[in-house]
């Protein structure tokens, strides 16, 4: 892997380094993805999720920056798996950038083939928001984790939160690092197992984690004390998830909730086998990859068997979309899929009404711009108290990484309202500079992923991948500033196709019209996708007469 010591920070303020705010937003968010406060391994262009990268190599990064700086307001830059390959004259309403990452003909869409092509410099794994330049640090998954636990509390315990409960989970990487804060935001306590001490320290630094220990006994003691005192606490435990889960099972200790958010989808880099440190695992992997993978599988199976034991003894368990069950099944565990997936269990009801992880980034770099938007949402969206509660919690407790940003689950209709409100605030001068508005690929109508977002669809359409392609094409012609289509995010190569977009609110009338189109179309196709699969809540929205038509409902 190429390694070059460079420290990247996004420009701040009102001064343009490019010929327009669309290009400027792409430049700043590409660089923000590689900020040391944001990225997992910026020296190697890795942003998060195993090997999810922002650009194929440093030469490609430099060429992207060069082209963004000279790109006209009626030109479009093409990115092929992290590498700029062309600039074409289009129109001012066309995307400034089109990104396609990691696409591979289905018959060849296997880990071995893909990573061989990647090693030869022919492709790049972009995860979801790494290669599409809209990663905002651990906050990017925070509300999804918060919403999952909140929905679990309502469904499983009949309560609005998890007060008095404790959660066992693992993984404090760029995605899993959201878990401890999401747990305490739901008024629960949690033990989060992590094998890498540096990741524990990073979550402490960013105020996502309250405390940590190397001792299971000490972690259990702290958990018990926090529950007795009614003081939600997140505890990082340095150790291996397979070892810890198995030991808790042997002791007969049954948590209220159990999950895992290691990067188990990546067998090479994402899951450290039992008995190894991060450093010794890397040495072992380099010396004997075949045996290393066998050990990884054995550890995943051991952890999964413990999770099933917890489930059978009363724990509420779920796979959090990291392909953990698939890896356990590949390792020989036939009943791995008795562990439910989190989307069909807890999140699909949100997706069905066009709700998902909406986000915005202050290109000024000033946190006050985000706080002003927070205040405006609290004032203007009183009809949605769940949204207001989240914004208040996030404003109080979320630490920014890189450019200040906010995420919230907003539904069809709300996204357009928020986008137009932000554009008005830029126009009026309430905000110091334009704002980039986007979302995760993990959303209502933008992904086909049978082990995660589209698992157990009502009509059996789990693997139908037309929808994310339609989503990307629709967003492009509606006026998104950049659009991306990726492969394999979250659940690994061969298991998902997904799309994303970003649109810039620069305060102009043109931006207003583009926002109206894009923020109607993007969640709207999610409503259609779920209505087409037979979800009543989606059908109900269409019957109310939204700003689109579905031919099968008059």
Curated annotation (Swiss-Prot):
Catalytic reactions of this protein: 4-imidazolone-5-propanoate = trans-urocanate + H2O
Pathway: Amino-acid degradation; L-histidine degradation into L-glutamate; N-formimidoyl-L-glutamate from L-histidine: step 2/3
Cofactor binding note of this UniProt entry: Binds 1 NAD(+) per subunit.
Entry's localization field: Cytoplasm
Cystine residue pairs: none
Major place of residence: cytoplasm
Transmembrane segments: none
Assigned GO CC terms: cytoplasm
EC numbers, comma separated: 4.2.1.49
Cofactor(s) it depends on: NAD(+)
Domain of life of the organism encoding this protein: Archaea
Annotated residues for binding of NAD(+): 49-50, 127, 194, 240-241, 261-265, 271-272, 320, 490
SUPFAM superfamilies, A to Z: Urocanase
Gene Ontology MF terms: urocanate hydratase activity
GO biological process: L-histidine catabolic process to glutamate and formamide; L-histidine catabolic process to glutamate and formate
Keywords: Cytoplasm, Histidine metabolism, Lyase, NAD
Catalytic residues in the record: 408
Role according to the record: Catalyzes the conversion of urocanate to 4-imidazolone-5-propionate.
Annotated NCBIfam families: hutU, PRK05414.1
Protein family according to the UniProt entry: Belongs to the urocanase family.
Protein name: Probable urocanate hydratase
Species whose genome carries this gene: Thermoplasma acidophilum (strain ATCC 25905 / DSM 1728 / JCM 9062 / NBRC 15155 / AMRC-C165)
